[in-house]
Amino acid sequence: MKSNTLGDEGNPARLLIKVTRETLPQVKEKYPFLYLEKGRIEIDDSSIKWIDCDCNVVRLPVAMLNCILLGPGTTVTHEAVKVMAAANCGICWVGDDSLMFYASGQTPTSNTRNMTHQMKLAANPAKALEVARRLFAYRFPDANLENKTLPQMMGMEGLRVRKLYEEMAVKYKVGWKGRRFEPGKFEMSDTTNKILTASNAALYSIILSAVHSMGYSPHIGFIHSGSPLPFIYDLADLYKQQVSIDLAFSLTADMAGYYDRHKIASEFRKRVIEIDLLGKIGPDIETILGKKQCSS
């Protein structure tokens, strides 16, 4: 945070007030995300500000934001990025309506203890399989997974998700021909698939920012592999049923098949807040990795 004071000769002097790690809110206390497009983020002497394409100015409380999703037509100054990093506010570059996740800016953390623990688990095949079982146990609380292999559990999950799609289609009386998404061909998808794609991309961004801020690596996964963010996809599967899948089918029915980007963004945001997603991520990682995470 910056403010102006008068120097000894009456001239304005800039005073930099350092924000310490201890004064920042924990991830669970932050607002999940803010999506911005067609504008500019910069800093003045008092705060981070957003200037939209109509020259409207909005102050951004970045210390209370988990991440900012930057859509098309956005620019951000070097100084603004520096202040957001100090406030532990993640930055993700996404496509229109958060449809595609492109990149993220990693905020610095005070130590690498959490990532070291994560790496040790992933490097040990037996322990990595234990972590995978704990992840699947969230979706199969009544199943005995003790002797199941990773391919077997992945097969169980595939069947569960396909059945879930069919149940949602029946529940909301929505036509369903299967999950389909081709990069660069978003408009070719049906409404339900469009909402699923948009919601999942936004979900990945939120989880990515939280994982970074807690000092874990998004690149070290236990179920997914061959992708750039396997740990993010591992975690996202815990929450998709509530924040993406049910939402997609219910909104398709509510909007009579039309794609209303503003309503989708609003309803997705409500779901994230209602289930207290940021309050769940930390404890869930603690349970999955068998370790109390470092405070953010």
From Swiss-Prot:
Top-level taxon of origin: Bacteria
Binding site for Mn(2+): 157, 224, 237
Transmembrane residue ranges: none
GO BP terms in the entry: defense response to virus; maintenance of CRISPR repeat elements
Pfam families associated with the record: Cas_Cas1
Coiled coil, from the record: none
An example Gene Ontology molecular-function term: DNA binding
Cysteines engaged in disulfide bonds, as pairs: none
Cofactors (names): Mg(2+); Mn(2+)
Keyword tags: Antiviral defense, DNA-binding, Endonuclease, Hydrolase, Magnesium, Manganese, Metal-binding, Nuclease
First-level EC class: hydrolase
EC number assigned by the record: 3.1.-.-
Keyword Metal-binding: yes
Binding partners and assembly: Homodimer, forms a heterotetramer with a Cas2 homodimer.
HAMAP family for this protein: Cas1
Family classification: Belongs to the CRISPR-associated endonuclease Cas1 family.
Function of the protein: CRISPR (clustered regularly interspaced short palindromic repeat), is an adaptive immune system that provides protection against mobile genetic elements (viruses, transposable elements and conjugative plasmids). CRISPR clusters contain spacers, sequences complementary to antecedent mobile elements, and target invading nucleic acids. CRISPR clusters are transcribed and processed into CRISPR RNA (crRNA). Acts as a dsDNA endonuclease. Involved in the integration of spacer DNA into the CRISPR cassette.
Stated name of the protein: CRISPR-associated endonuclease Cas1 2
Species name: Chlorobaculum tepidum (strain ATCC 49652 / DSM 12025 / NBRC 103806 / TLS)
